[in-house]
Amino acid sequence: MSVVSKGLENVIIKVTNLTFIDGEKGILRYRGYNIEDLVNYGSYEETIYLMLYGKLPTKKELNDLKAKLNEEYEVPQEVLDTIYLMPKEADAIGLLEVGTAALASIDKNFKWKENDKEKAISIIAKMATLVANVYRRKEGNKPRIPEPSDSFAKSFLLASFAREPTTDEINAMDKALILYTDHEVPASTTAALVAASTLSDMYSSLTAALAALKGPLHGGAAEEAFKQFIEIGDPNRVQNWFNDKVVNQKNRLMGFGHRVYKTYDPRAKIFKKLALTLIERNADARRYFEIAQKLEELGIKQFSSKGIYPNTDFYSGIVFYALGFPVYMFTALFALSRTLGWLAHIIEYVEEQHRLIRPRALYVGPEYQEYVSIDKR
């Protein structure tokens, strides 16, 4: 008997060694390592190696990985031209899709199972270039390629803003990249897997993921959560706003609730701490943080009995805003981080358990209808 699972809830489409989630206890692990340990003691580059190769790197392996990233920031001029030909008012994820598709069209010699992991590292570096230049295009600035450095986060921030980032900014960006790296198989990862299952190339699979990420119920949630803080504007208005919008009008509190977690999202706790390291030098970010804190208290009081708590998108926008990024870039920053997770999943699927993903639909329409000519209708 066929069973319809709306939203594919509780449907397992692959086995994985990548990410473990315990939604009841609020546990998230990459390859067996707690997210808290990776954030507190590791780096994004170490996470790249871990996700692709299955273990933490030695010093030599880490240095080799950093060298590879530094070599791969360059993208063909035609790709940058494609982004800059678009109007700066264009949607950031739309621009990123354009750039990613352009790379797919140029890389004509791609073949699966030929240096897949090395190819993934190259793509991760190039995505940093694309995301930085999506921001620069929308701000009306000239193209800029990330400069080689000892930190992926530093190279990305320097390319984006054309200024030397502070230690706190580099640290926050690095940790944000780790936090958004992977989360099993949400909509965007599923979209990437469907594309990769046809043996489409990696770039095209990422384009499919970006299309899914764009939606406000997935990657766009950080933008929507932050827009709430902007709308409230003043910490003293939080209570009235909450009563009006959430309690009376029954609007969804963005940044709250998760399909998997029935407790506080462990990533949200870390993003909240990261925000505290950045807001002291940014009055607006500090004000939005105060609003978020008060909104969190009201939200937990209202919804915790239903297992609804802050998710990763609730505080991440404040971190990105404090780093200097406007709201329109939040989803693109999510994509920069999640590129690693997408690639790790599609490589794992194609190399170890490849099968064309082809689900069925349960037909509930009429059994048979006799065709009636247009003159007799």
UniProtKB/Swiss-Prot annotation:
Catalysis: reaction(s): oxaloacetate + acetyl-CoA + H2O = citrate + CoA + H(+)
Q: Which residues form the active site?
A: 258, 313
SUPFAM superfamilies (alphabetical) = Citrate synthase (SSF48256)
Keyword Acetylation attached: yes
The alphabetical list of record keywords is: Acetylation, Allosteric enzyme, Transferase, Tricarboxylic acid cycle
Please provide one cellular component term from the Gene Ontology annotations of this protein: cytoplasm
**What else does UniProt say about it?**
Citrate synthase is found in nearly all cells capable of oxidative metabolism.
Subunit text: Homodimer.
Name this polypeptide is given: Citrate synthase
Q: Which organism is it from?
A: Saccharolobus solfataricus (strain ATCC 35092 / DSM 1617 / JCM 11322 / P2) (Sulfolobus solfataricus)
> Taxonomically, what lineage is the organism?
Archaea, Thermoproteota, Thermoprotei, Sulfolobales, Sulfolobaceae
